[in-house]
């Protein structure tokens, strides 16, 4: 049986998650990409709690132009950095969730770095 793109992504995700884990001092910034929206959340793996979350779905109601493109993904990165700053989170571990570090995933990372997150 041939492997689909999504199956390959899931294998990469498992391989990546073996190597990285978020802690209380340095939580994990997870990015998920669907066909319509980009989601980002900061997770503390020690407690299993989501500390901060946002998406183009949430931002789109507040700002025009927050679509599922690079510009919208960059807005998600800046928003997650702003929300993390409110919870005094400065350093995170970036989890690309099996996606290639390109396009919208890279735009989220660049936006988060511009917003002040370190990774």
Swiss-Prot record:
Keywords: Ribonucleoprotein, Ribosomal protein, RNA-binding, rRNA-binding
Keyword RNA-binding: yes
CDD domains per the UniProt record, alphabetical: Ribosomal_L18_L5e (cd00432)
Keyword Chaperone: no
Gene Ontology MF terms in the entry: 5S rRNA binding; structural constituent of ribosome
NCBIfam families for this protein: L18_bact (TIGR00060)
Function, in words: This is one of the proteins that bind and probably mediate the attachment of the 5S RNA into the large ribosomal subunit, where it forms part of the central protuberance.
Subunit structure: Part of the 50S ribosomal subunit; part of the 5S rRNA/L5/L18/L25 subcomplex. Contacts the 5S and 23S rRNAs.
Protein name: Large ribosomal subunit protein uL18
Organism from which the protein derives: Nitratidesulfovibrio vulgaris (strain DSM 19637 / Miyazaki F)
Encoding gene (name): rplR
């Amino acid at each position: 049986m041939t492997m689909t793109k999504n199956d390959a992504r899931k294998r990469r995700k498992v391989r990546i998650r073996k190597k990285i884990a978020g802690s209380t001092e340095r939580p994990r910034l997870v990015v998920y990409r669907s066909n319509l929206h980009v989601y980002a959340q900061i997770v503390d793996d020690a407690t299993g709690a989501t500390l901060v979350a946002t998406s183009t779905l949430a931002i789109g109601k507040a700002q025009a132009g927050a679509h599922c493109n690079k510009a919208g993904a960059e807005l998600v990165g800046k928003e997650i950095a702003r929300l993390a700053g409110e919870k005094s989170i400065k350093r995170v571990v970036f989890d690309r969730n099996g996606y290639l570090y390109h396009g919208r995933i890279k735009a989220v990372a660049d936006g988060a770095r511009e917003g002040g997150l370190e990774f």
